[in-house]
């Protein structure tokens, strides 16, 4: 990584579920706090699995967060004394999130976003691909495939223990009872006629 001499840039943390995205976001935020920098964390209101007002990793690490309904609501909470803006579960935000992140970085903030880069079908998820394209730094994390133990880059949605069909709804917030990390070879997405 290169030394950045100017303020304002974008970092994307992405990967499958259970790859440590929220944990990495929390780690980066805590490091900034140790350095006496002011950070604020946002999350979409839809993410209420573990807490309404915290970003919580699957292993229980947490940091206070401001839940917002729309991307542009983030601006209402930004003050000039802040250094770092962190956004978890970025794939759940509306299409304005790309512009919001660009504006914040252009204003001199370090912007850290974390989210799924692929949906349960293995296709690009929401605005994450665009954010990856404009980011100065991209960290792609992998989990361990729950079926074979290989590196997992995909998220398997399970309904009653069976892989969800391709045309099932994209957004369904859940935890380990609904999703598993899978490698390319163990990931399965049948069509409804295959079920």
From Swiss-Prot:
It holds the Pfam family TK. Zn(2+) binds at residues 145, 148, 183, 186. It catalyses: thymidine + ATP = dTMP + ADP + H(+). GO terms for cellular component: cytosol. SUPFAM superfamilies: Glucocorticoid receptor-like (DNA-binding domain), P-loop containing nucleoside triphosphate hydrolases. GO terms for molecular function: ATP binding; thymidine kinase activity; zinc ion binding. This is Thymidine kinase. It comes from Bacillus cereus (strain G9842).
């Amino acid at each position: 990584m290169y030394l950045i001499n100017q303020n304002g840039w974008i970092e994307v943390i992405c990967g499958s579920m259970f790859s440590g995205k929220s944990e990495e976001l929390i780690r980066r935020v805590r490091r900034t706090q140790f350095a006496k920098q002011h950070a604020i964390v946002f999350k979409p209101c839809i993410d209420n699995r573990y807490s309404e007002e915290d970003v919580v990793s699957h292993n229980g690490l947490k940091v206070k967060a401001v839940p917002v309904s729309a991307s542009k609501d983030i601006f209402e909470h930004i003050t000039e004394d802040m250094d770092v803006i962190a956004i978890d579960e970025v794939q759940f935000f509306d299409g304005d999130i790309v512009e919001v992140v660009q504006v914040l970085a252009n204003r001199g903030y370090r912007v850290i976003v974390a989210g799924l880069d692929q949906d349960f079908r293995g296709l690009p998820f929401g605005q994450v691909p665009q954010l990856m394209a404009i980011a100065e730094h991209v960290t792609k994390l992998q989990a361990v495939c729950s079926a074979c133990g290989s590196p997992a880059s995909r998220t398997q949605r399970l309904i009653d223990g069976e892989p969800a069909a391709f045309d099932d709804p994209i957004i369904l917030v859940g935890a380990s009872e609904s999703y598993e990390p899978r490698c390319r070879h163990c990931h399965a997405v049948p069509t409804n006629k295959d079920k």
